[in-house]
């Protein structure tokens, strides 16, 4: 029975009745109805102002982010929706971000050794996605009945937008973009341009990839989204090419600045430049950076791991 609930499906759900939805989610019908009516009451919004890591450049602007933190029982229901409805979908090949089994490495690999790489960022993607767009995803794209689409929209949106912090939001953001980017996909297919997405990061590569910029910007603008010019990057092969924080060109790699900052972090630990009050957080930050490097290039991560281990042994942080 559980296998049929979680069976891989195409980009369609075709849920027409409340009883079918309740079965797929393994939840009582009355719970879905009652919680959808008061879903907005279960959020605890806050503004996230991340403290810069001690090894980060102090001049970097700290980015504030509004988090629409969902709590139980809504959080539990959203997790069910993600795991049983959204995660099992057969996602289009060009969508990478937020898709189980896909990684940053997989996202950048198709663009390796490209003559030109173009990247665009969608500004404030989650807050700009509307309830109407989410409803259309459930209804038009995934084939749910109007009643079911409305119920699922109430369970997965907050104050008329896609909530940052909900487990369903990345998948729904992917689907919203997929529902509006047909002109982009068609143009890329026609001009033999490789196109991939990582949530709000769009990447294009190929001889004619520069030509897709106007098409992409117009398609996004027509659906209420913006792609700031300052976030547009055109990277020919003779320049340094990078995507979602990874260095490209011949093979995926770590940006030089990232490696340097990580080594600097270990050095500051070794020389006692880190206040005792912040040492645990600092070490976690360095460990996180090394884990990221290990994912991309285990060989380059090994010396950093050893250096950090020796440092921690000597300083006993």
Could you say what each language-model-derived stretch is?
Residues 119-123, 165, 169, 190-206:
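Catalytic palm active-site di-aspartate
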